[in-house]
């Protein structure tokens, strides 16, 4: 595989991820996919980024269910997603932007890791491109865009 073909595949997957996540991707600094779970998940990822540099051993001592201790353990800690979003959170302090960019990155990486896996199995870049597209952009990921931790699937193809 030439690096230019890999770059073209990644560019196509980024474009598809931006289209797939619209309208949040069109106004990423102040729009989330919904007012329910995405708001909570953006908060959790921002909390993780905040706490990782402030007091990493107290990561689970979130203020979300104050005064209960270790309240982040009441739900998903989202640490893998938070690590993807952390640089944006640290640089901008904008949880919505960080969450939206992490979602776009997750979809792009999901498609690309499946591309790499399928290419290794089939030896065909065209089939690998279609496999990556089908893996990341399907009815399941479309309905679960509200839950970044559910569509954070880029790790599975790497397991094989």
Can you say where each PLM-predicted feature lies in the sequence?
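Short alpha-helical segments and helix-capping/turn motifs at coil-helix boundaries
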Residues: 1, 11, 29-31, 46, ...
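Transmembrane alpha-helical segments
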Residues: 110-117, 156-160
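Generic alpha-helical secondary structure signal
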Residues: 10, 75-86, 128, 132, ...
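Helical transmembrane-bundle signal
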Residues: 13-17, 113, 135
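Start-transfer (signal-anchor) and selected internal transmembrane alpha helices
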Residues: 1-22
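Membrane-interface starts of transmembrane alpha-helices
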Residues: 4-8, 90, 94-102, 123-130
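Transmembrane-helix signature of polytopic, membrane-embedded enzymes
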Residues: 114-136
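Membrane-interface coil-to-helix junctions
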Residues: 17-110, 138-154
